[in-house]
Amino acid sequence: MRQQQEADVVALGRKPGLLCVPERFRAMDLPMAAADALFLWAETPTRPLHVGALAVLSQPDNGTGRYLRKVFSAAVARQQVAPWWRRRPHRSLTSLGQWSWRTETEVDLDYHVRLSALPPRAGTAELWALVSELHAGMLDRSRPLWQVDLIEGLPGGRCAVYVKVHHALADGVSVMRLLQRIVTADPHQRQMPTLWEVPAQASVAKHTAPRGSSRPLTLAKGVLGQARGVPGMVRVVADTTWRAAQCRSGPLTLAAPHTPLNEPIAGARSVAGCSFPIERLRQVAEHADATINDVVLAMCGGALRAYLISRGALPGAPLIAMVPVSLRDTAVIDVFGQGPGNKIGTLMCSLATHLASPVERLSAIRASMRDGKAAIAGRSRNQALAMSALGAAPLALAMALGRVPAPLRPPNVTISNVPGPQGALYWNGARLDALYLLSAPVDGAALNITCSGTNEQITFGLTGCRRAVPALSILTDQLAHELELLVGVSEAGPGTRLRRIAGRR
């Protein structure tokens, strides 16, 4: 392994060794938030808890095939690592076993920054296979908890950059914000910093970005301290729980059916992604009097229905998705909007997988989301957050305990939207073609779907346990198929019945 790392180092045009940072950054311990430490306590080799991002880049017109390799090499030669990227977890007897952050004075960039190359004539499948391997392993806790891989050999001379960061250090939104700080709308700008050279702003370092979509532990923990909302919360949760138990749906459902998606996970990962023009989703949304997020959920519901049918595992009851919502105005977090701070909760939405018609499914999902938002619209933020925490409790307990305690029934899948940058963006002249966010499956929730909007397209990043959710490419193919069916209905005009176009599945 070390020989391979040194070969990659030579390929990047530098000598193996340690990067020494200024003496003023001598080792020091910084407090770690309890919610972040939970991700270290809960992590195991079969349950690594890091997030990732995959950026696909087109090299500038005047760039050579190894243009980005040269840019990376020049960045390493600058020997600059921002303090936030030098943090590693540390605990000792003096800290009574509690986790803290230690700022390293020496950072081994030969280890953290790597070069990979796809085989000749490789395509998208080979790229995702490589990223699946990169995303599977745990990060080394004796080092700062991040890794960057430059991947060469994509069709058309393109490259990809895979970033891996531990969930204790950052979540998907934080990674997105960091990435936004190193790109520009100017295709001619050069000498731009790499990710590890950029200091984290307070909003990133302190984790004030929206996190409810992927941090059920944080969500549940934060609610327990909101004592002012407890009296009203008891009545609200009791009412919501009763309705959820009666109708098998609602913002706090207790009736998610068991599927292969809810099995205990193993260490191997499978990741996949796809992207679509946002205008096609807008077309469907306008035709159906729905939101873009409703269309996203309908696509996911249809894809999961087809996937489970292919495995003979579709339950009679509809699948339930955990979906982030803004508690500021009860609006679903929009991939093409701005995040509303940390006022984030979750709704449990029926994906209507018991319905064969995509049109009927979209209508049911639209109604489910509207009912969920209406249920929390009249509540205080603390009460709504408490409701969200109870809905997310099964996944939080699964993450902490390594299993889902009976008789809790967690949602079948988490589907989250992370706001992304708009317009054409560049890094040192290389155009950002797509950006996929990857998450961390946990026991009881073996599949995570994270959507993001970039440059008038929406990307779907799917992260799953390879054993529980094999062949993720089936899901990406079905996402495209579901969108085509919905677009076909919107183009056929009002009142068109989908069964006449696509038949009944």
From Swiss-Prot:
Q: What class of enzyme is it?
A: transferase
Please list the residues that make up the active site.
H167 (proton acceptor)
The answer to whether the entry has keyword Acyltransferase is yes
UniProt keyword annotations, A-Z: Acyltransferase, Glycerol metabolism, Lipid biosynthesis, Lipid metabolism, Transferase
What is the reaction catalyzed? an acyl-CoA + a 1,2-diacyl-sn-glycerol = a triacyl-sn-glycerol + CoA
Induction remark: Induced in response to low levels of nitric oxide (NO).
InterPro entries (alphabetical): Acyl_transf_WS/DGAT (IPR014292), CAT-like_dom_sf (IPR023213), O-acyltransferase_WSD1-like (IPR045034), O-acyltransferase_WSD1_C (IPR009721), O-acyltransferase_WSD1_N (IPR004255)
The pathway entry for this protein reads as:
Glycerolipid metabolism; triacylglycerol biosynthesis
A GO molecular function term, named singly, is: O-acyltransferase activity
> What's this protein's function?
Upon expression in E.coli functions very weakly as a triacylglycerol synthase, making triacylglycerol (TG) from diolein and long-chain fatty acyl-CoA. Has no wax synthase activity.
- PANTHER family annotated for this entry? O-ACYLTRANSFERASE (WSD1-LIKE) FAMILY PROTEIN (PTHR31650), WAX ESTER SYNTHASE_DIACYLGLYCEROL ACYLTRANSFERASE 4-RELATED (PTHR31650:SF1)
Question: What family is this protein classified in?
Answer: Belongs to the long-chain O-acyltransferase family.
Instruction: Please give the name of this protein.
Output: Putative diacyglycerol O-acyltransferase Rv0895
**Highest lineage ranks of the organism?**
Bacteria, Bacillati, Actinomycetota, Actinomycetes, Mycobacteriales
